[in-house]
Amino acid sequence: MKTKKRMSIDESRRRFMAYFSSVGLGATLVPGILWGKMQETGSQQITLDMLTTSLKLGGVEFNAEERQAMVNTANQNLTRAVAMRSFHIPNDVTPPFHINAIVPGVIVNKTPQPFALGKVPALKVPGTLEDVAFWPVRHLSELLRTKQVSSVDLTKMYLERLHRYNGQLLNTVTFLDELAMTQAKAADAEIAQGKMRSPVHGIPWGCKDIISVKGYKTTWGSGAYKDQVFDYDASIVEQLREGGAVLIAKLTTGELAQGANWFGGMTRNPWNYGSSSGSSAGPGSATAAGCVGFAIGTETQGSILSPSATNGLAGLRPTFGRVSRYGAMTLGWTYDRLGPMCRYAEDCAMVMNVIAKPDGRDMSLSDIPFNWNPARYDIKKLKIGVTGLNSPNINPNAQKLMDVLKQLGATLTPLTIHPNNLPQFNEGFTYEQGAFFDELVRSGGVAKMTNPGRGNGFKSARLMNVVDFLQQSRLRMMMMTNLAKATAGFDAYFSAAGGGGGQRGAGARGAGARGATAEPPPTVPDTPPRGGRGGGGGGAAGGGTGNTNSAGYPGVHVVTSFSEPSTEAPVGSPQGITIYGPPFKESEILFIAKSFQDVAQLHTKKPVLKT
């Protein structure tokens, strides 16, 4: 073989693979010219004549033995690729590898402790039942326990509000009136006998519409799937049903868990109808509007924290491996999480009591007990880290949080997370979503999407090299280890640096519709998102929570102030801070958020709703 014009078979294979990756056919080993000839003839196999002609056009030479070897190898790979793609892979089948948020340096409490709730004042039902629509789940549960109100009454009230306000808010895809009333009646019968299945027994709730409910449409927010029905419930639906909660609606998601736009329009934020945040847009909007007791959202890159920020909620993104994803649409097997979106931090703990447990289906789950009892915690003894504590440019919302925590006796400790000079880690889900939606792309289903441009990310996954993906995963592990070392010994932390109320909303399972932006400087942890306009994109929670998100850390958003009232936002828009914790420290960060809320009482503020 000539040294200048010819190449080894191994080198040619690499070049063939690189070329076919660029045209979305990375599983094959044939050059572009050869592929064109195959298309012209309709052949599924390469012939020696095809290869010989293509090599001449390409200006390279191989001897007969080398050409035949190339034909054999290419045809073998083509046959394997065709065979692999002929299989339909069910949605619930995951790759046989999982990440674990517990890396060297992470210490977790594996001792189960009794679950207990904080004390509440004596409660009495107002003259009009609808006045409790914005009450914390903690208070609603007490009304049910003391039999001052029935689950049927609460369910009817919340369903009526969902129907009344949905025309403006567009936060509901499917109303589950009949199912809800059946579950509410069953809850009342058990509560009347003194049987409380869980802290959320009898509480009406809604789930994001990427979570399957047997026999009902699960649309994923997309025109390509708007008639999709599964014959099984997601684990989280089963768990909450077993806990006696009452499912009343499938709530909107941005198309395929991105942004706030779906096939029915753009879901609205009740504080400001001109803005929104996703992709858990419906859960955020419905909870903030007092149309459900609580909701379940999902997050890959910001889709719980960002809409919680925009809608003024105490939304919890649990530790990766804490809550089952079985039955929920996948964007990233090593990123996706499900969690509660509530008005009050302790409400999140009540929901977590039911859903934070292994289910035997999602093999990424860790059997770490979720322990909640506010009486066990002392704010003075928790180690709370603050990055940028001595910054000349303090985020005013961080300052409000710090002022209250200091008032309660907390000690705030400066925390430094050193630069690691490693690449960004928030693009890894692109590979994973490309695999999950591979059949959609190959079948031409992208054309049926409400926004076909959303499918470009799925297609681009085929431009990526599997070696790069694995190397990026190793770098991700380095980042996780560095973060674990930096936060070792801390119970919680947040960022004080920055001048605003947070960042705008984000990409996949984040606020905007154009995708995520860059990660903030690695010297500080993620600054909390405020959420962006649906369809707007911007720095989102997608980019803004990158390190803690990729590391699997929990976070809870808490409202610390409201902007000045305006024409668009009659009572102002919520602003706040996200409190993060090391893996499986949900109870600690929820306790800190609850402690702030109990003083500030901002969670009792209500938006002005339109009909």
Task: Please report, for each region that a protein language model flagged, where it lies by residue.
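An N-terminal boundary/leader segment
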Residues: 2-182, 403, 407-408, 605-611
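Short helix-loop capping/hinge segments that flank enzyme active sites or metal/cofactor-binding pockets
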Residues: 118-131, 200-220, 378-387, 427-484, ...
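A short helix-breaking turn/cap at a secondary-structure junction
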Residues: 118-123, 317-398, 598-611
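Short, well-ordered beta-strand elements within core beta-sheets of diverse protein domains
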Residues: 139-146, 225-228, 336-343, 459-464, ...
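Glycine-rich, small-residue loops and helix-cap segments
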Residues: 147, 202, 242, 246-248, ...
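Acyltransferase
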Residues: 148, 155-156, 185, 393-416, ...
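N-terminal, positively charged, Ser/Thr/Ala/Gly-biased leader segments
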Residues: 169-220
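Short glycine/serine-rich loop/turn segments
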Residues: 199-338, 387, 497-539, 565
